[in-house]
Amino acid sequence: MELDVLGLFGACSYALDCVEAELVHVTTFHAKRVAYMSVCTAEQFGVSGEALQDLAVCALLHDNALTQYLHEEFRGDSSAAECLPELPHLGAHCVMGEENISALPFHTDVEHIILYHHENADGSGPFGKTWQEIPLGARIIRLCDLLDAFCRADIFTPDVWERANAFLTRVRGRIVDE
């Protein structure tokens, strides 16, 4: 029997969308957008083949432990999800997420991609890592995660790309690469 790994991870992403819908009563398809943007960005850096496939999977599953974290942090009180942007220790879901994917059958080394996907270029992220200490995959997912949050559909306006470009210019060197 042959395992369709991409199909499996697509199904996992769908399951995460369902959990998101249950928690915050809306499905945003955030993981799918981040995965798509991550693949497009990684290709510009010359990433291809199995490494690109593994990055796509990591991007799909980058927030795989977010609901687990919320459940543990708030003892199952899903109404706490409303305060998500203000959670002080959101990096904990990165640790849980890294553990969750550790036994998955990746083709390449994906260690620390999930763990460091909220790190900032200047070391101000949850683990204090600077850009040179963070795998390229995690840096790409960080950038695409920020862009998706910035350009999400509920705040979409015709000038969204100009605002996104201005945002990236403001945070260059602090949050993302120069």
What label would you give each PLM region?
Residues 2-178:
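Histidine- and acidic-residue-rich, metal-dependent catalytic cores
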